[in-house]
């Protein structure tokens, strides 16, 4: 027994000593594909957190931390939460309350490895004005300006989570086209004011998650004078101020330049510490501000605006633009196989604005709670003494106010070897943490990246417009989208799915860009709350839904004034796959009531649904629509919209994309024979009509040639038959009956043996008589021979009447020949009793003629005629002097 233990310990020692040192990959094969997302919701609502891994784990767990406690694992028995698992996806449903607010993250266990997702925050929707009415006394403004100026009024500051939407009222009538900013301060922008703009203005903030509305008591009394006023330099109005602007990377930001004067001033922009910020393709100078699209981190800095109307001094604004960026790990940690008890240092580098905070998790446990771990500054983790509990998955997290990012690596620990009591080598039990990870096919090709949660805006009393995007990814291609919505009023409301299949669209060359999509949902009820989500259908015919939108309150807008309808002026053929729309408004003053435009288009030959495109900005007068078919006629229509309503459709107008270009270059004729062998990739293409014409012509020529060949063969066969007729007569003459002669020449060299030797003399006399009648009957005999050969039936002679006792079969030609011979003999002999030949060949014994039916139908034995061998010609046959046939 002791020997067995010693052997096992020695074997384990050798195996551990043979383990090579591997560099851990930053992407170990098991990772979180989809982390739960932060959500803002009102009390009593239900939210769903989704977690997905690259491989199905052994089990999922969810952890939760409030603002006053550390993370702890949740149990599904709680009435406020429910947890469901489906292969590699886990879902946590939480009922929003004060007790459930906090941070959530999921943990996927792969044997001893624990992979943790990024953190999702659950926050309560709130809206407050801060300080009551007294806090807004300073916002009561009375302004008097001249016509033509641009007025910008900041309504007030409120606290709202999420950011509110703003509504402005003019003389207590809601303005449908108020231009607002996406921050906590609503801004009313009145461009090119006139006397009609005079009046009282106020604002209302609405929480987009809960639908709660807050009317701010601040007001603006505006008086626009049409009379000439003294010239004044540009100046700020009471309540106008220069402020710091905060925006995120990838967004569009508008820097305003407030101020009025007489005459109205113009703005000039510069940036001393942002090179190239003003003159680039992402920057647009507007009469009232500077718009920067697709904001980048390098765009942050100071921007200076000068308002000048020719009267000194000019008004100078300095605006500080702060660009925020979500954290991103640029250098992931990497670990080697480490011996137990040794020190180890891991490094993680991340970028982000504000600078992200970095923390570490060891198999799901915070390193701050580990006595052997020392998180240092600049993303450094120092393990003073590596322990077996550290073996597993080590993760680095970077977080700031905009989000969180993570990266991880596998840490393998080689346990310390100890000596056993019997002196043998051994080691402590050690389980390699990656044993449950490898051996499974990594889920790369089947990854389905879901779209973002939709952004909802009002389109009409019964419809809304949804906008969502798909980030660049290497997952499965998306075929189309489906929109789902659910009304939150009442109980038992289930998700409804629209009928429209929203295509993903053609692939473009900008693979690294975000793809945006737009779709409308109709058939809704006003004054109701809804939630929306997007269902993506992938190339494997599976689907995955996005996160749900926040609660959306569909406000009734029956009392709103109608918006101006844009007029399509021209449709320019831009390329084979794109056109440019040009439109106009009846009056430039209508721009103040418009936030943007919706473009609808479809092929004119189709009766299907219209495709949609969104055009931001009321001052836009042209827009390019791409991804069209070459040489195709499309029909287009436009619709203007504001934050709360949309106009009627413009008149339909048709436009065409450019036709495909056909090369007109004439290639020179090449007379030399091409001896090269074509490759397998070369193809020969013909027009289908040309191919059919060539094929039909070839078939017609083949039919004509076949008909000519058949006609020639028929004529040739007729000529051959005419030439063969004398030949047939010669063949019939080869069959010579006994005691007869040829109708043309005497057959003197034939030897006939008869029963009576004296009959030879009589036979010679008969032959001489037959020669005298030969010329008279030659023509008739020739015709009879030809006709009888082809038409007459075979004749059977009465053999007994002819003097034969036996029966022999004779050919039809020889029988007919014998019949004619008998007829000639009877005519020459002059009667039945004139002949003395004992053969009686010329007359029958019963007194019948040779042509009588009785003679032809007789069954008595007949004479036998033996066919002689055929010589080369008839003359040679007659002159050969040989015995050709013997008649018995």
UniProtKB/Swiss-Prot annotation:
GO terms for molecular function: coreceptor activity; hedgehog family protein binding; heparin binding; patched binding; protein homodimerization activity. GO terms for biological process: compound eye development; cuticle pattern formation; homophilic cell adhesion via plasma membrane adhesion molecules; homotypic cell-cell adhesion; maintenance of protein location in extracellular region; segment specification; smoothened signaling pathway; wing disc anterior/posterior pattern formation. It is a single-pass type I membrane protein. SUPFAM superfamilies: Fibronectin type III (SSF49265), Immunoglobulin (SSF48726). Residues 710-888 are cytoplasmic. Glycans are attached at residues 80, 185, 192, 281, 336, 365, 369, 455, 516, 547, 681. Coiled coil: none annotated. Residues 655-667, 843-859 have a biased composition (Polar residues). Heparin binds at residues 486, 493, 531. Residues 450-557, 565-660 form the Fibronectin type-III domain. Disulfide bonds join 51-106, 155-203, 257-305, 348-396. Residues 760-775, 872-888 have a biased composition (Low complexity). Mediates response to the active Hedgehog (Hh) protein signal in embryos, functioning upstream or at the level of patched (ptc). Homodimer. Heterotetramer; 2 iHog chains bind 2 hh chains when facilitated by heparin, heparin is required to promote high-affinity interactions between hh and iHog. This is Interference hedgehog. The gene is iHog.
